[in-house]
Every structure is written in structure tokens, then in C-alpha cells.
């Protein structure tokens, strides 16, 4: 019986001591101990976050590890401008074949066929990218099949818009490099039987869609 009383008394004592400890931790403004305010909690959390890595024995090694572990931002690469040929440089047979392939593909192939031939088209475009813009337009104007293909492309709005947009970018790059000399523009207009002043105005204004339309409507054939 005594053993039971001692055991019960000891358990009650532990329970009371636990409750008193809990009440002291959570006491309000009327208690003897105040709860931690928000600022103190924030300070402790900041302190905990600022502790060095457990694996770092020296501060210098920790800083170096953090420095080299940071991801470096990717450097922006500037687009490489084409090294345009001279207007007087004649187009090669392979360049003419590539030009013909691009025009015929854009004019005749279905959307699915164009997607499947995307790699071939890009390859052909890259090979004719450095042809002088006026020499390229002259080659178009002098080939009836290419003129017919260009007119078909005009009837396919989405194809034509992409073609004009990409071609205009290249022509503007050429203009920024000073590829359109007064003599070249005059020679181009004379060869195609166009008004030199009109062509000069179009080139100076970089109205490339208009220039292409003039060539299509006035072929040298």
C-alpha cells in the first residue's frame, strides 16, 4: 500500500512540475516571464541561417565554396553578320540551284512537306545568305520559273509573310554594312529597266517588301 502511495505521489509531483514549467513558458503579460516578441524570433532565425556550413572548418573555404557554387549568368551572344559578296560577283550554279529549291519549296510544298523539308531549306538558305541582295533580286527577275514561284508564294499569306520578314532582316543587315552603294543601285535599276530614283528611294527607306514587289511586277524577261 505504501509503495502505491509513493508511486502515486511521485507521479503527481512530476505532473505538477510539468504544468508549472509549461505555464512559465507561455505566461502572458500578467505572468513573471514575457513571451518572445516577433523581433527576437526574427533575429534568432537570421542568426540560424547565417551559421556557416558544418563541413567548413575555415571561413575562407566557406566563402570560396559559396562563390564557385553560384550559377553564372549566360553571356548574350551577338548575331554574326553575313560577309556579303559584291554586287558584281556572279552567282554560281550551286547558288542558283539553292535559290530555286527554296522558292519552289515555299511555293508548292504543303505545310507538312515544308516542315519535313525544314532542314534542307535552312541549309540552302545558309548557303545563299551572303549573296548581295541586289544580285539575288536580279537572279529572281531574270528567271521566269522563279518569278512564277514568287507569285505563288504571294498567294500563300503565311509563307509570304515569313519569307518577307526573314529576307528583310538580311537586307537590313546589308544596308547597315553599307552594301547598297549608289553605283550598285543605279546599275541594278538599269539592268532591270527600272527608274533609278524610285529604286534609290525604296532602298534608302529600307522598304524591302516594296522592292521585291517591284521586281516581281517588272521581271527582266
UniProtKB/Swiss-Prot annotation:
Highest taxon of the lineage: Bacteria
Tell me which family the UniProt entry assigns to this protein.
Belongs to the chlamydial CPn_0875/CT_734/TC_0107 family.
Q: How does it sit in the membrane?
A: Lipid-anchor
The name under which this protein is listed is Probable lipoprotein CT_734
Subcellular location per the Swiss-Prot or TrEMBL entry: Cell membrane
Q: Where is the lipid attached (S-diacylglycerol cysteine)?
A: 25
Say if the entry is tagged with keyword Cell membrane. Answer: yes
Q: Which organism is it from?
A: Chlamydia trachomatis serovar D (strain ATCC VR-885 / DSM 19411 / UW-3/Cx)
List cellular component terms (GO): plasma membrane
Q: Which residues form a coiled coil?
A: none
Amino acid at each position: 500500500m505504501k509503495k502505491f502511495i509513493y508511486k502515486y505521489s511521485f507521479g503527481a509531483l512530476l505532473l505538477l512540475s510539468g504544468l508549472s514549467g509549461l505555464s512559465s513558458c507561455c505566461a502572458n503579460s500578467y505572468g513573471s516571464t514575457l513571451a518572445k516578441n516577433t523581433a527576437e524570433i526574427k533575429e534568432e532565425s537570421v542568426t540560424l541561417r547565417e551559421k556557416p556550413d558544418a563541413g567548413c572548418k575555415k571561413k575562407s573555404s566557406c566563402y570560396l565554396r559559396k562563390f564557385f557554387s553560384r550559377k553564372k549568368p549566360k553571356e548574350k551572344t551577338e548575331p554574326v553578320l553575313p560577309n556579303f559578296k559584291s554586287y558584281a560577283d556572279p552567282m554560281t550554279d550551286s547558288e542558283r540551284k539553292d535559290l530555286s529549291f527554296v522558292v519552289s519549296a515555299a511555293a508548292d510544298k504543303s505545310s507538312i512537306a515544308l516542315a519535313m523539308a525544314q532542314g534542307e531549306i535552312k541549309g540552302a538558305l545558309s548557303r545563299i545568305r551572303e549573296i548581295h541582295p541586289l544580285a539575288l533580286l536580279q537572279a529572281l527577275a531574270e528567271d521566269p520559273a522563279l518569278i512564277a514561284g514568287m507569285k505563288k508564294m504571294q498567294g500563300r499569306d503565311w509563307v509570304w509573310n515569313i519569307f518577307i520578314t526573314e529576307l528583310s532582316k538580311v537586307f537590313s543587315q546589308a544596308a547597315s554594312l553599307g552594301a547598297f552603294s549608289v553605283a550598285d543601285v543605279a546599275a541594278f535599276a538599269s539592268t532591270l529597266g527600272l527608274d533609278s530614283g524610285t529604286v534609290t528611294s525604296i532602298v534608302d527607306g529600307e522598304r524591302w517588301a516594296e522592292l521585291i514587289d517591284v521586281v516581281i511586277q517588272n521581271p527582266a524577261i
